[in-house]
Amino acid sequence: MKKCFLVCLAVLGLVACTPDEERIDLSGVWQFALDREGLVKPGDAMSDTIVLPGTTDTNRKGDAIAWKGETTHLSRPYSYKGRAWYRRTVTIPEKWAGENVYLTLERTKPSEVYVDGVLVGSANNISTPQRFDLTAALTPGVHELAIMVDNGSGVPWQVYDSSHAYTENTQTNWNGIIGEIALTTSLPEKEAIPVHPAFKDFHIEGQQFFAGGHPIYLRGRHDACVWPLTGHVAMDVDSWRHYFKVCEEYGLNHVRFHSWCPPEAAFVAADESGIYLQPELPFWGDVNPKDTVLMDFLMAEGEAIMREYAHHPSFRMFALGNELRGSIPKMTEFIEHFRAMAPDKIYTLSSNYYLGYQGVKPGMDFFVTCRVGGEGWGNYGTHTRGSFSFADAADGGMINHFYPNTRMNFEEGCSLAEVPIISHETAQFQTYPNYDEIAKYTGALYPYNMEIFRDRLEKAGMADQAKAFHQASGQWSLRLYKQDIEMDLRTPNMAGFQLLDLQDYPGQGSAYVGILDAFLDTKGLCTSEEWRGFCAPVVPLLIADKFCYTNEEVLHADVQIANYGEESLKGKTVTWSLGEKSGAIVVPTDEFGLIDAGVLDIPLADYQQATQLKLTLQVEGTKEFNTDDIWVYPAKNDLERLKEMVVITRTLTADVARRLENGESVLLMPDASEQTVGGLFQTDYWNYRMFKTISENNNRHVSPGTLGILTDPAHPLFASFPTEMHTNWQWFPVVKASHPFKLDNTAADYRPIVQVIDNIERNHKLGLVFEFAVGKGKLLVVMSDLDKAAEYPEGEQFYLSVLRYMTSQHFAPKTVITVADFHRLMTTPVVAGEIGKLNNISPYKAEDYK
């Protein structure tokens, strides 16, 4: 019998079956056998059954989970790696005599296809359908069709370690066949697809993308193939319609698929929605021309992606993978080869190749990056996003480092390139997990990691605070996301961003960085309407030097509009309000892009008390409005007088202890470095465990690893310092000068007035402000240098509010300890569990990126 072959069409795309095609649907129950030793033959008895489309996981086949201690990612209740057999009989009708017969496996792993026990084809493409010409083998009559799928071999080893087509961090390395499984008498033919207005005349001018005759801005997200119910990508159009609907609700118009390519259904839904897609090769690592196995595999995958999907209007951009390093000439060779196949696309070597240190190279139409070229440590002039790990940028980047403002942007970094710059994996601010989410995992994956994190918190005596930790860290994360996104929007020469992420990433140490959970459901942090206030085609932007003022100042700010909508705004008004004050600005220009709308000068003398206000901007004709918090404090206060009314010290000396025991009030601001963590303003980046490991490997400072504060705004300590339960911009001077204390050795129910939320690895009870009754006196401990913080109006106001509290009747600590007890608390080491090592595929070693 003539051996059949994998069909490779020399066309740029394939669509649904033609109307005159005959089709036999092969979905349903198949015979099944695991082949752990590689000894099963296609004709052997197979006593088990399985439902296809599906995987061994969704059918609960393979090895039942034995160890439930995994915290790096979600767990598979049933898993299998190796060869597995799927077999069934097929009946070819007489009317198919003389017809071609093709088998389509829309998405699977390396496979072998047998008809009546004879091998008739094999394939190892994982990004596109596998199609086999079985004409010679499937004549009219009854035949036995057997398919061996191997998720343990057949692709280069680097793909298992890196690609989101395989990784256990998200999609899992499943075995099975998903999507369409069918026999047909013809192959899909390329059809014309209606072009959504968003894609018309898409091109590049200078550093901007254009479509429809005007500049557009790519407001994107990173996608890592997170489908927690199935453990594999959705293959139906409706699921992808829902996916893109959520993206649109949150103002996004772009998705980057990190080291993988989505299926046909995604492109169909994106074509309908007007969402720009950037698929990638299934790779993250070193491009080594000498590794011909890897190079040939990646070239074949790219060619297959172009043949299969390039006709889709939504497929506009392509990259060779994630954070590649190695041979730039080889990367360029790949790009030019794919460009010849699909010249209407735009190409880049890799998302964040060489972590951005190599800058732009010939052949790159655009640059997805976190920086443009190298920089000295502590120099942020090349950066194109606001947050970094401590391993990758001094002090974790610009947002954590600089005094809060709405003026800083990435214009300097973007000016180092001449192509459009897209901010790579923007934000990555952690939120403490929501353990109510555990109940939602009813499918192929289970969050034993979340159960372990919950148990750790309970062991630390803080289980009752889990929801508050989630809400407080999430609200602060939301504001940090807003800042990072607006830094992009107020950069005139930036072309877009790709968030990491709108959705939680449940792997790589468990990175709860999403505004939505892993199911794309809300976490209750904000509505989509509130989010679109700063993430939409048209966004009004407050450009100011600070958020905090005294009442002797005038709030001076510029107003800009990121106008990437479809029409000119000339003559339209931008209304503003601040408390009871309001006004309007008339837009003076008909330009698109980032435009100057006008200036605000708002006197603040009316505010005689410390006040938190909302400054709101809204562009005429838009539903959304953008809101920033503003704080106004009295310029004159009685801080110096109040300092004389309490004992202020950095050390609890014998004399101070005696005065405390005899009834005086003591404010202790210790310089202690033992039993403390550092002061981190933003929530920790991505995942503490992973970047702790990377920082230590590279002799970098380890991030303090915290997730913001938790407090009670109604506590009398805040009578003169308006606050929410969470960190906000007015906390910057106090937090940056802080070193929160580990209160693990206090009673389980003891709570500090201002608590700092720790990460899921350590679970320390961290105190920024806490109090005790000692003898006849009262002790307030502030783990921050308030004299340093008082250099700013908000820091001075916090100091004032602390002292007003201490000199009021409300200062009445309930927890009683002795001086000796307090000394033991401050000096007794806290017993902490060991944090496991977790490395990343990108090594972050400077010598690897030069």
Regions found by a protein language model. Give the residues of each.
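Aromatic-rich peripheral "rim/lid" segments of glycoside hydrolase catalytic domains that contact
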Residues: 341, 500-565, 829-830
